[in-house]
Regions:
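Single conserved hydrophobic/aromatic residue that forms the stacking wall/gate
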Residues: 490-501
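Membrane-interface helix-loop-helix junctions at boundaries between adjacent transmembrane segments
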Residues: 116-222
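Helix-loop-helix hairpins and the membrane-proximal interhelical loops
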Residues: 40-63, 190-274, 286-289
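Active-site core of bacterial EAL-family cyclic-dinucleotide phosphodiesterase domains
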Residues: 426-488
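Transmembrane alpha-helical segments and their short flanking loops
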Residues: 2-12, 51-57, 256-261, 314-420
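Cytosolic juxtamembrane regulatory segments of multi-pass membrane proteins
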Residues: 170-177, 311, 316, 412-435
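Helix-loop-helix junctions within the multi-pass membrane cores of secondary transporters/permeases
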Residues: 249-329
Length: 501
């Protein structure tokens, strides 16, 4: 049973979709962190500081931080479409020219459902609110474009024979691109005429808004539970759940002082460290995995997690699309939600009556929300419960990580050996798929190993049958801290690339 689960998890993690989405989301981490940090600095909850920014001489700095935030989060969906298309094409090992065409097609398909030039256009669709549509349409448009390119009748090859220049590929892909863009716009128009709602991201918001509204009328606890579960489940699949459901939260979960659950309640007592209550992950890694790769990553991510920006952890470990960590990632916030809700219902915590900015650090947020140490205590209990919940899964993930790493290197070495047998020059570093990514990662590790003198020589004596030693064979060895002994073939091949670096 254990082997079946292991194979199933590996199959999911190594799937084409998983590689594309994880790579695409990883590439926009700088965008997210830049915008998130600017927001955290702008909204840091200290009254004199806020007075200085909004009413004193620091107004220019406030405007600057706002521009940075809007300039990053405001184009989040556009950036995601580009990285999805790029990752899709690179995973297909396409040429640079084809990669560009994939990006153009995805942007055209995404733009076709934004209702540009009509009164239904909403600039929010370009930002984090539209990231579900960006991922969904970006991936499907690339898939459709890839299939249409296989139809030679659509590629206009007879019209480009003998033609030179960069426009050849553009002409050949004219019809496939037009079909994909027109198809996206047509579906948007058709569903809009039927439902009266135009725009993919607006369809999703409307459905979830209606569901939350119906449940909220019946039970504030259940509607909050649904919201908590849905947000973190979306995050697991790489969708920025809190941003996708922002409109739902504004309409259904505002701070009124009459009900327990609100968006501010979720930010303070549930989303500690970000989605999945990842402050618990951070502490667990720092306490129990200090010497491992994930422990070192946690040290690097500490500053951003303090402000509830956890992308370095969720994509670095990774947690996103990692089936091993699905259960604690989704259910730890549910546990924290139930603890905080119970503490409020029984009177230990007061009902939240004012907004608390989502980027407020843990501890400060608990104090501001409750006005006393009680909010901090509830946060601490939730974090401790999260550590205990996450810990066994993190240990399993660590073992699986070592297993996967060695397996990936075995695949790389196997391909390298095949190239050697065929007397063919291996070209791994320029490949766009996961083999290329592993090769480039190992090349960086080899640079570090050479710099720190971690490579060494072993000498194997050559002895005649009569016991006389006639010489020795020198063997270059590299003991990688994760992958173990690296094949001499790769070490020498990568060294050739290092000479040219």
């Amino acid at each position: 049973m254990k082997e079946v689960l292991k194979r199933g998890m590996l199959k999911f993690e190594n799937s084409f979709f998983s590689h594309v989405v994880r790579c695409a989301l990883g590439m926009i981490i700088p965008l997210v962190l830049t915008g998130g940090i600017s927001c955290a600095v702008r909204d840091f909850p200290v009254a004199p500081y806020q007075m200085f920014l909004t009413q004193g001489g620091g107004r220019w700095f406030y405007d600057f931080l706002t521009m940075v935030y809007e300039g990053t989060y405001g184009i989040f969906s556009v950036a995601l479409v580009i990285t999805i298309a790029y990752s899709y094409a690179m995973e297909k090992n396409e040429s640079l020219e084809n990669v560009v065409m994939y990006v153009v097609v995805a942007l055209a398909a995404f733009s076709a459902q934004l209702n540009l030039g009509t009164e239904d256009f909403d600039v929010a669709g370009l930002g984090t609110t539209g990231c579900f549509a960006a991922m969904f349409i970006g991936y499907l448009s690339c898939m459709a474009f890839s299939k249409l390119r296989r139809c030679h009748k659509l590629m206009l090859e007879q019209y480009t024979a003998g033609m030179g220049g960069g426009c050849v590929l553009a002409i050949r892909t004219l019809i496939p691109l037009g079909i994909v863009a027109a198809g996206s716009g047509g579906v948007n128009l058709l569903i809009g005429r039927i439902t009266g709602i135009y725009g993919c991201y607006q369809w999703f918001n409307h459905i979830f808004y209606a569901a939350c509204q119906n449940i909220a009328d019946y039970s504030n606890f259940l509607s909050g539970l649904l919201y908590t579960f849905a947000v973190n489940l979306m995050w697991f699949f790489g969708l920025h759940g809190s941003h996708i459901l922002e409109a739902v939260a504004v309409h259904n979960f505002g701070v009124t002082g009459n009900v327990v659950f609100s968006k501010a309640f979720y930010d303070v007592y549930v989303a500690m460290g970000g989605c999945g209550t990842t402050v618990s992950v951070l502490i667990a890694l720092l306490l129990f995995f200090r010497k491992e790769r994930t422990g070192k990553l946690a040290g690097l991510a500490s500053f951003t997690v303090v402000f509830n920006l956890n992308e370095m952890l969720t994509f670095g470990i990774p947690i996103i699309l990692n089936p091993i960590l699905l259960v604690p990632f989704v259910l730890t916030p549910v546990v924290c939600y139930c603890l905080a809700y119970a503490a409020t219902v029984c009177g230990f915590l007061p009902v939240l009556t004012h907004e608390v900015v989502w980027s407020t650090p843990v501890g400060i947020g608990g104090y501001l929300a409750s006005g006393s140490w009680k909010g901090i205590a509830v946060q601490a209990v939730g974090i401790l419960a999260g550590i205990l919940f996450y810990l066994p899964f993190l240990k399993i993930n660590q073992r699986m990580e070592v297993y996967k790493a060695k397996r990936h290197v075995q695949v790389l070495i196997h391909e390298l050996q095949e190239k050697e047998e065929q007397i063919d020059q291996p070209v791994f570093l320029t490949r766009g798929d996961h083999i290329g990514m592993i090769s480039r990662m190992l090349l960086l590790d080899l640079k570090h190993a050479i710099k720190n003198k971690e490579l060494y020589m072993l000498y194997q004596p050559q002895v005649y049958s009569d016991g006389i030693c006639i010489g020795a064979e020198a063997l270059l060895r590299w003991n990688h801290p994760v992958y173990g002994m690296i094949c001499l073939l790769y070490t020498s091949d990568a060294a050739d690339d290092l000479i040219g670096v």
